[in-house]
């Protein structure tokens, strides 16, 4: 990004995986009057005036659609479970706005669907996603369904894979969601 800025472009397109890592570069763009367009990665702490516009998916809706489709595939397993079941979610991070919204959209819709079928739900794992979850109604030990959310220490397929394997190794795990390409490749 710094090389691109040094060439004094007429504009810059940016899809940052680690949004906090580009803040200094965005300040430099402001000082050089270089407009920045972000793609599908809202930068929550972007310096004022540094983002000309954002082109993005409705990530909360995308997560919600993923939950609806997954639930259609697993609802009979959930309904007939003799004990607690786990639905996993792997997010590459808890800092990029698009990942936060997509992961949160999945969790919130899954909670809604499970509760509509009479199940109690807990969200466990990564603190950001646990705190952001809406309407979870049970403690982990007491829930019919636990949505287990994992975020690796760094954004790599290998570390997402490690997180996915930790969830998948639980005998009562019935499904897992990878919220973007990196996380999905790790799940696979």
Regions found by a protein language model. Name each.
Residues 1-188:
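A residue-level marker of the well-folded mature domains of exported/periplasmic proteins
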């Amino acid at each position: 990004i710094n090389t691109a800025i040094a060439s004094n472009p007429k504009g810059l397109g940016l899809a940052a995986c680690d949004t906090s890592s580009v803040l200094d570069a965005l300040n430099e763009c402001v000082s050089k009057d270089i407009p920045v367009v972000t793609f599908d990665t809202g930068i929550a702490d972007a310096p004022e005036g540094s983002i000309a516009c954002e082109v993005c998916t409705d990530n909360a809706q995308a997560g919600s659609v993923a939950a609806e489709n997954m639930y259609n595939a697993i609802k009979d397993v959930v309904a007939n479970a003799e004990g607690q079941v786990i639905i996993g979610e792997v997010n590459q991070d808890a800092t990029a706005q698009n990942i936060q919204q997509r992961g949160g959209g999945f969790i919130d819709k899954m909670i809604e669907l499970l509760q509509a079928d009479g199940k109690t739900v807990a969200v466990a794992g990564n603190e950001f996603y646990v705190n952001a979850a809406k309407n979870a109604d049970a403690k982990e030990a007491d829930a019919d369904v636990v949505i287990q959310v994992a975020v690796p220490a760094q954004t790599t397929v290998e570390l997402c894979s490690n997180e996915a394997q930790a969830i998948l190794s639980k005998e009562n795990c019935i499904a897992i969601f990878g919220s973007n390409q990196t996380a999905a490749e790790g799940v696979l």
